[in-house]
Amino acid sequence: MTSEQQVEAALKSYEDVDSWKTIIFLYNAALKEVGTKLEILNDEFQHVHQYNPIEHIKTRIKTPESIVKKLRRYGHETSIENMVRYINDIAGVRLICSFTSDIYRLAEMIGNQSDLKVLSIKDYIKNPKESGYKSYHMLVSVPIFLSDSVVDTKVEIQIRTIAMDFWASLEHKIYYKYEGNTPEYIKQELKECADLVA
């Protein structure tokens, strides 16, 4: 059975489709909550300082196929419980800024939101990945208020400059072009470019 067939089989094996839909509903709601907060912070910054630190905001929900592949890569069975427990980037927000200083200013503003709980921070700007990748990642939990309950839902926020975003996009495309076997000389050139644009 090919890996694609395994993914299809795993997706079909979700016993409770309603649970799957509910989880995705919660992640979409969390993206809306976080997106609204970020737009308000950006508007406030413009009002007070006549400057917008956020160039643009991108959001996404991981596809079911991507979720299954990631669970398998981590050695976990495909289940709703494992998806929620082990995959932190099902809901993702990417903030693109002009300057590195904007990244840290935004991270501080996000961290000061009383109803967002910062679960973890990975600063790949101060500590870039070996490949040269640079970005600031925050994993936050946002309360989703439903008619009969409140559900804390995780959202990964990536904050990076325009240059860092361009580099990350290029690296991603090259990785898939070479199917994960990027030639060493290209890796080295990418690393040098990352050092230049940061």
Q: What are the residue ranges of the model-derived segments?
A:
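An acidic, glycine-/histidine-flanked metal-binding catalytic module
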Residues: M1-L31, G35-E44, E156-A198
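Short aromatic/hydrophobic contact patches that present stacked aromatics
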Residues: G92-I96
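Short N-terminal helix-initiation segments at or just after the protein's N-terminus
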Residues: L26-N42, E77-Y86, S98-I103
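Charged, low-complexity, helix/coiled-coil-prone segments
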Residues: E4-E15, K37-E55, I80-M83, L139-D148
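Short secondary-structure junctions
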Residues: D43-F45, G75-H76, S114-L119
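Long beta-strand-rich cores associated with HINT superfamily self-processing modules
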Residues: V84, C97-A198
